């Protein structure tokens, strides 16, 4: 009996001395040992991580040493190391792993923080960014180029996110997409002297106003040209015929013969336009088709008399949308995609003008009546310049912008000399100021227009820099 007591006491002491032997292995999960982090991180004491890390290199639980991260789908949250690059440890029901979760001995899985598909530079679509990164690491291991992200979403398709800022606020792009098919590029040709060969001499823009091919543009774009060619947005080209011209208003109507219906632009009410409204100008400056500029309406009623333009009785729309050579004749539209003007004139940076759409409506109505009655369009005299009256305030503004601007306060300021015209042949240049013709003083641009209609020879005195130069220009009679 005494021997049995001694044996039981020995076993009890053995169990107390080694509690880990009290339970057989596998009967339960022991709590994970707490990670003890050093008070200060010393990277020099860190063991170098393996070079082959499929999950990428990440910081350890203490945020000190670099270790190999676990792959997507690997276990995490207990004794396991941290998840790899771009992955997070998530326990059941999608809860991110935390210290509380770990104390409760719950295991999780490494899940990619990004769930949307991406397109790689290897032209493959990956389920998420983490899979692409893993593929890139495998590629580099094989001494191949790394795989980089080309776009969000699957390869070969755009990423449409209706909640993105660019989707909500790109109203200008919406307008351009709507109007661009009805905007045309116009190429102008003339025959060389003593030759039948034609050469391109100028270009401009226009927009379609009827499904059967009527196109509105500026008069100065198409006049004095032997041949007018129109190119649609799809690249198709057509010969165009000039149907009607209003030189004073600088509006022309041309037509192409096209099988089928063409896209058209509708005319808005320029009388309802407000200063500060957003506008879009589209055209073909420098033959660059469908070039878009945007701006606001500076004023809706800039008088022709104030500007010294050819139609002194008409108000113009002033805008800071850029209108360049070749943009002329293209539409100026509001955010509803309605034409509220024809791009016609750039004076200087930030100051451009458009012919109001209400004037276009009047021209189209009168043109219809003229063609219905069979009235012929009379010939006109033409020298090939675009000009504006020079006032003291405008002269001061131009002097501030251009130091070599002539020291003059009135006259007709030449904005543009059209190539291969009497003006160019006579020697006129841009920025010249016409101060007299045939001995008569020139105060406004209208003075020049009046003399051109009456005289067959123009002996001009122009101020160029600070010199007065005598130039002779012989107007040409042309079909408008």
From Swiss-Prot:
The active site is at residues 220, 250, 328. In the brain, mainly expressed in cortical areas both in glial cells and neurons (at protein level). In bones, deposited in the matrix, with higher level in newly formed bone compared to fully calcified bone (at protein level). Also expressed in the tendons (at protein level). In the articular cartilage, detected only in the deepest zone of the joint cartilage. Not detected in the chondrocytes of the growth plate (at protein level). In an experimental arthritis model, at early disease stages, up-regulated in articular chondrocytes in the deep layers of the cartilage (at protein level). Residues 204-364 are annotated as: Serine protease. Disulfide bonds join 37-62, 41-64, 46-65, 53-68, 76-89, 83-110, 112-130, 119-155. Disruption phenotype: Mutants mice exhibit reduced retinal capillary density, as compared to wild type animals, in all 3 retinal layers, nerve fiber layer, as well as inner and outer plexiform layers. The IGFBP N-terminal domain mediates interaction with TSC2 substrate. Its main location: membrane. This is Serine protease HTRA1. Residues 365-467 form the PDZ domain. Residues 1-22 form the signal peptide. It is found in: Cell membrane; Secreted; Cytoplasm, Cytosol. GO terms for biological process: chorionic trophoblast cell differentiation; negative regulation of BMP signaling pathway; negative regulation of transforming growth factor beta receptor signaling pathway; placenta development; proteolysis. GO terms for molecular function: growth factor binding; identical protein binding; serine-type endopeptidase activity; serine-type peptidase activity. The keyword Plastid does not apply. Residues 33-113 form the IGFBP N-terminal domain. Forms homotrimers. In the presence of substrate, may form higher-order multimers in a PDZ-independent manner. Interacts with TGF-beta family members, including BMP4, TGFB1, TGFB2, activin A and GDF5. The gene is Htra1. Its EC number is 3.4.21.-. The record marks 169, 171, 278 as: Involved in trimer stabilization. Serine protease with a variety of targets, including extracellular matrix proteins such as fibronectin. HTRA1-generated fibronectin fragments further induce synovial cells to up-regulate MMP1 and MMP3 production. May also degrade proteoglycans, such as aggrecan, decorin and fibromodulin. Through cleavage of proteoglycans, may release soluble FGF-glycosaminoglycan complexes that promote the range and intensity of FGF signals in the extracellular space. Regulates the availability of insulin-like growth factors (IGFs) by cleaving IGF-binding proteins.
């Amino acid at each position: 009996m005494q021997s049995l007591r001694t044996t039981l006491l020995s076993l009890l002491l053995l169990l107390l001395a080694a509690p880990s032997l009290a339970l057989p292995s596998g009967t339960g999960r022991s709590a994970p040992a707490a990670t003890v982090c050093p008070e200060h991180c010393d990277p020099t004491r860190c063991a170098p991580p393996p070079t082959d890390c499929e999950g990428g290199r990440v910081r350890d639980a203490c945020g000190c040493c670099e270790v190999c991260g676990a792959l997507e789908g690997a276990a995490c949250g207990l004794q396991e190391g941290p998840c790899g690059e771009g992955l997070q440890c998530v326990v059941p029901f999608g809860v991110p792993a935390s210290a509380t979760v770990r104390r409760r001995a719950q295991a999780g899985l490494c899940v990619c923080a990004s769930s949307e598909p991406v397109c790689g530079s290897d032209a493959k679509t990956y389920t998420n960014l983490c899979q692409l990164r893993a593929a890139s690491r495998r590629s580099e291991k094989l001494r191949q180029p790394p795989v980089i992200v080309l776009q969000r979403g699957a390869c070969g398709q755009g990423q449409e996110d209706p909640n993105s800022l660019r989707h909500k606020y790109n109203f200008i792009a919406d307008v351009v997409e709507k109007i661009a098919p009805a905007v045309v590029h116009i190429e102008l040709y003339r025959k060389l002297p003593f030759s039948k060969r034609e050469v391109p001499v100028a270009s401009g823009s226009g927009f379609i106003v009827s499904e059967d091919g009527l196109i509105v543009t500026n008069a100065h774009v198409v006049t004095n040209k032997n041949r007018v060619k129109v190119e649609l947005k799809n690249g198709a080209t057509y010969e165009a015929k000039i149907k009607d011209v209003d030189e004073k208003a600088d509006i022309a109507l041309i037509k192409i013969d096209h099988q089928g219906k063409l896209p058209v632009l509708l005319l808005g009410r320029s009388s309802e336009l407000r200063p500060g409204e957003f506008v879009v100008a589209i055209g073909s400056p420098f033959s660059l088709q469908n070039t878009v500029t945007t701006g606001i309406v500076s004023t809706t009623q800039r008088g022709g008399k104030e500007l010294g333009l050819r139609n002194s009785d008409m108000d113009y729309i002033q805008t800071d949308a850029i209108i360049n050579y070749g943009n002329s004749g293209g539409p100026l539209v509001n955010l509803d995609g309605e034409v509220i003007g024809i791009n016609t004139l750039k004076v200087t940076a930030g100051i451009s003008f458009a012919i109001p759409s209400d004037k276009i409506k009047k021209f189209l109505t009168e043109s219809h009546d003229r063609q219905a009655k069979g009235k012929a369009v009379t010939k006109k005299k033409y020298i090939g310049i675009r000009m504006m009256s020079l006032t003291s305030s405008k002269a001061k503004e131009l002097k501030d912008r251009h130091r070599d601007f002539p020291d003059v306060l009135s006259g007709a300021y030449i904005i543009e000399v059209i190539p291969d015209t009497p003006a160019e042949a006579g020697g006129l240049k841009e920025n010249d100021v016409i101060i007299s013709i045939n001995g008569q003083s020139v105060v406004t641009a209208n003075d020049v227009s009046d003399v051109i209609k009456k005289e067959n020879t123009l002996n001009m005195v122009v101020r160029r820099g600070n010199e007065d130069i005598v130039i002779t220009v012989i107007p040409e009679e042309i079909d408008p």
